[in-house]
Amino acid sequence: MPQISRQEYAGLFGPTTGDKIRLGDTNLFIEIEKDLRGYGEESVYGGGKSLRDGMGANNHLTRDNGVLDLVITNVTIVDARLGVIKADVGIRDGKIAGIGKSGNPGVMDGVTPGMVVGVSTDAISGEHLILTAAGIDSHIHLISPQQAYHALSNGVATFFGGGIGPTDGTNGTTVTPGPWNIRQMLRSVEGLPVNVGILGKGNSYGRGPLLEQAIAGVVGYKVHEDWGATANALRHSLRMADEMDIQVSVHTDSLNECGYVEDTIDAFEGRTIHTFHTEGAGGGHAPDIIRVASQPNVLPSSTNPTLPYGVNSQAELFDMIMVCHNLNPNVPADVSFAESRVRPETIAAENVLHDMGVISMFSSDSQAMGRVGENWLRVMQTANAMKASRGKLPEDAPGNDNFRVLRYVAKITINPAIAQGVSHVIGSVEVGKMADLVLWDPRFFGAKPKMVIKGGMINWAAMGDPNASLPTPQPVFYRPMFGAMGKTMQDTCVTFVSQAALDDGVKEKAGLDRQVIAVKNCRTISKHDLVRNDQTPNIEVDPETFAVKVDGVHATCEPIDTAAMNQRYFFG
């Protein structure tokens, strides 16, 4: 058989098994673990390439015969479940139809079943690109609809959160309260090119207000200290969530007025709960809310302002708190409230706990102490900072950082999908799931996606001057594509609701045109179901110094003064 050098092969078809890829300007390197294509039978689009009539493209099978709608060729997949692999990815009916070898089985060996390329198939050349699942942000304050565009520009295509616009309640809490508001927001998000699931208000001792919100269409309850995060509110929202099979998210009581962290853990009664702000700078029992990350029933996340921990983190957080929670810098009690939440010791520990797989998810806390367009960026910056601070993880092979990278990718893809009950639809690159995918140039991985595929259609991309003679001339901006236009946006985006709402006919009653899918399996999961982030060590916090110990070992790191993929990548 004819042979070519590894370097020449990489130039033609991209890297293969054993090749390594540097991610951006970080010190993180991934290595391809396996290649699902056949050497010498690669599917390649272009002039003089193999995907031509009668060659790699079948010229007699129709779409009714199962031909793909779209194929991404020779791409490097980075997925928390699959690992780091090389493959073609086939898309059909807006879903992932196959991962393996695409082409024409009439003339090619080893074509994966369901991955026939034909006249009905378009192609994206993935030879020198990385493919991930689209990001999921589980902590969205629905303050402004423009958040969706900024999130897509950093590879996030699903929102879970609440609000009704720039009210003070929405600025401070992630809540869409009551059936009328819920209905209007379900109708409003029809115009956004992202998936959306809405959180209702869980601060209720009464059954009626909780039940009516579940039937109206929420995917979960948010219990927030600004509305009173009492033990009774937690117990009753969790009990109703058990009945409805929806999630409960909590921002606990910073002032410890309603009890301490031990009382909140007792109020959980062993039930599954998603804890926002697990570190506490964004809110929660001062100074030791971080202890909840040790509980097997707690699905812990934290938000991106403190990730990675930098020399300016403490200073900017104070002003964030004052604005978001309607506080007055001239009132000493308000100042004390804000200062109680900002603790460099626990912020440092938060970064370490992410690296250890103890805190399982990243989110933004959009416009309410977090940046909606920086989730992937902060994920990779934190991974890089932790490698510099803590060295290689014991799970990583000597020559690559695959495990660490996959641990961090899981925090923004599959784990929030599991936590919110949508992992049967999105969250990973797996056959049968919705084709919500992001393509990255490795030089910009985590910072700037090349394009976002939403439900099988490109709906967001870096695009040059529309009046130019090519797609590439400057100025290159992120722009909406055809997948984000007209009725196609409705076909390719999902509104998630409770099963009770779906059974009650929320789609018809609210006049929704988008896909409407019920969340499920929210109440039967535990932290041990979270991918690569399932650790439950003992966590202690010194009440005087705020030092955090994990299984008796001090968990800390120094703040960084330089971040990867920062000023080199962005103007300003």
Curated annotation (Swiss-Prot):
The gene is ureC. Pathway: Nitrogen metabolism; urea degradation; CO(2) and NH(3) from urea (urease route): step 1/1. Keywords: Cytoplasm, Hydrolase, Metal-binding, Nickel, Virulence. Its EC number is 3.5.1.5. GO terms for molecular function: nickel cation binding; urease activity. Binds 2 nickel ions per subunit. Expression of the urease operon increases the likelihood of bacterial survival by contributing to acid resistance in vitro and in vivo in BALB/c mice. Y.enterocolitica enters the body via an oral path and must survive the acidic stomach before being able to colonize the intestinal mucosa. Substrate binds at H224. It comes from Yersinia enterocolitica. It catalyses: urea + 2 H2O + H(+) = hydrogencarbonate + 2 NH4(+). The active site is at H325 (proton donor). Its cofactor is Ni cation. Gene3D superfamilies: Metal-dependent hydrolases, Urease, subunit C, domain 1. Ni(2+) 1 binds at H139, H141, K222, D365. Residues 134-572 form the Urease domain. The modification N6-carboxylysine is found at K222. InterPro entries: Amidohydro-rel, Metal-dep_hydrolase_composite, Metal_Hydrolase, Urease_alpha_N_dom, Urease_alpha_subunit, Urease_AS, Urease_asu, Urease_asu_c. Belongs to the metallo-dependent hydrolases superfamily. Urease alpha subunit family. Carboxylation allows a single lysine to coordinate two nickel ions. This is Urease subunit alpha. PANTHER family: UREASE.
